[in-house]
């Protein structure tokens, strides 16, 4: 999810956004984006923090494993609806270019840390509740149009990074270091 990508780095790029039907000559097949779908995907990415979007690929290749991975231009190399959509998208993005580099404003954050993520990967009981809890919180936020962040909690996390969130949810934090405990206590004592 783009929310998870944003937790790693707040300003990211989409390297290979789909622009046509796709597939290899050995496996994989998927339909072409419907009219307007490339714009929808691009704007969704921008709304979630992307500062860069690159469409894969410019021109459909005529040989190789990705022969069926269609690009903006088809085999005939002529202008088409996909090129028109990308051109229109470019003009739309120019109107909002000042948003590039803007901070995503989340209403709440879901705290995560590697100790508990790794524990949930190997502990059959922890895994069941960890994954479903986070998934349901994410789905509820999406359905209610409530912007949220995943927030990586480590022993290097500072209070300043947490205080911007009015609400933090730390589902099933079974492993907690002394440093993180003090940090969360400070967050609560300061009104979080």
Predicted feature locations:
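Carbohydrate-binding surfaces of carbohydrate-active enzymes
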Residues: 1-192
């Amino acid at each position: 999810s783009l929310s998870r990508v944003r937790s790693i780095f707040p300003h990211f790029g989409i390297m290979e956004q789909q622009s046509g039907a796709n597939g290899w000559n050995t496996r994989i097949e998927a339909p072409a984006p419907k009219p307007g779908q490339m714009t929808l995907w691009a704007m969704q990415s921008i709304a979630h923090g992307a500062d860069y979007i690159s469409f894969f690929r410019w021109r459909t290749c005529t040989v190789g494993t990705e022969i069926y991975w269609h690009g903006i231009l088809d085999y005939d190399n002529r202008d088409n609806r996909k090129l028109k959509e990308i051109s229109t998208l470019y003009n739309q993005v120019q109107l909002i270019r000042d948003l590039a580099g803007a901070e995503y404003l989340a209403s709440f954050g879901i705290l995560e840390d590697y100790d508990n993520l790794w524990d949930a990967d190997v502990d059959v009981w922890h895994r069941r509740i960890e994954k479903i809890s986070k998934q349901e919180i994410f789905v509820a936020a999406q359905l209610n149009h409530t912007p949220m962040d995943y927030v990586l909690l480590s022993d290097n996390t500072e209070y300043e990074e947490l205080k911007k969130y009015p609400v933090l949810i730390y589902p099933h934090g079974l492993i907690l270091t002394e440093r993180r405990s003090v940090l969360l206590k400070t967050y609560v004592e300061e009104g979080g």
